[in-house]
């Protein structure tokens, strides 16, 4: 049985999603969701049920199955013969997969137990997007090594800023609960706020470097990468706006010691601009305008 999705106006590319692929995507989603249920159950357990805050050694192990199957399905969705497809649904799914992968890797070195209650549920929902919003057009110039490098770097930058945004949300909740004197049990496994803040700026610095490389390669090699000179579209404007926001934030941290709520607001503003730059433009073109 086949569920077909096509570009009705242009009819450029016919993309079919098989029942097998749908079931496999559901399996990935249920894998993430099942893990999320257990994580939230442990997170909301009364303090008396946990004598001391402990790490959950089983969580990274349990994450291997959905993470690996998710990677396989993304590979099949993106690489179709000699063509390369990366629609808005697949792009978001790749970003959340990279986000989970980075979190999974870092969890062996940092205490990030509280962050997993946000990352894993998001993966459960967004891993289904390649089925709901499949690509309808192949990307151009995908044979160029420079294009592939540009694409990989940009997706890594998005993933790091996604982690930074989730990190900021967790810090905001933690700060509010500390002031109220009512810190949830799962947040007691997190490092102190100052340690989390230092980690946040490390993440943002790494993302800023990758974003700089993405924008720089787009400017210098625009004609080779995209077949036309760089144009100041809303995608370009929002991309540079996010670069300015994150750059100003890092400069403010270095020069004036910015921290706390100021850093949180700047992080979310930069991430929102980045979402509008890439995901927003792809959504409008592919879903609304069907181009």
Which stretches of residues belong to each language-model region?
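Cytoplasmic-side transmembrane-helix entry/capping segments in multi-pass membrane proteins
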Residues: 54-60, 89-90, 113-124, 263-268
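Interfacial loop-to-transmembrane junctions
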Residues: 251-273
């Amino acid at each position: 049985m086949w569920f077909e999705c096509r570009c009705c106006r242009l009819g450029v590319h016919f993309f079919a999603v098989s029942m097998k692929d749908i079931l496999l995507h559901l399996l990935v989603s249920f894998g993430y969701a099942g893990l999320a249920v257990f994580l939230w159950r442990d997170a909301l357990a009364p303090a008396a049920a946990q004598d001391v805050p402990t790490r959950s050694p089983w969580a990274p192990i349990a994450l291997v199955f959905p993470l690996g199957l998710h990677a396989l399905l993304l590979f099949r969705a993106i690489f179709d013969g000699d063509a390369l497809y990366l629609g808005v649904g697949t792009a978001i799914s790749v970003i959340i997969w990279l986000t989970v992968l980075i979190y999974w890797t870092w969890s062996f070195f940092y205490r990030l137990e509280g962050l997993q209650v946000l990352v894993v549920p998001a993966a459960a929902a967004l891993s289904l997007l390649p089925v709901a919003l499949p690509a309808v057009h192949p990307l151009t110039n995908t044979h160029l090594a420079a294009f592939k490098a540009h694409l990989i770097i940009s997706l890594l930058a998005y993933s790091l800023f996604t982690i930074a945004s989730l990190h900021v949300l967790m810090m905001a909740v933690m700060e509010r609960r500390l002031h109220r004197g009512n810190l949830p049990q799962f947040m007691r496994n997190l490092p102190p706020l100052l340690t989390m803040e230092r980690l946040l700026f490390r993440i943002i610095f790494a993302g800023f470097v990758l974003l700089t490389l993405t924008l720089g390669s787009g400017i210098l090699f625009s004609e080779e990468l995209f077949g036309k000179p760089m144009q100041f579209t809303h995608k370009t404007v929002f991309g540079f706006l996010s670069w300015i926001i994150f750059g100003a934030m890092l400069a403010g941290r270095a020069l004036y010691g910015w921290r706390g709520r100021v850093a949180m607001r700047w992080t979310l503003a930069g991430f929102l601009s980045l979402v509008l730059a890439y995901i927003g433009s792809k959504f409008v073109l592919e879903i609304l305008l069907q181009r």
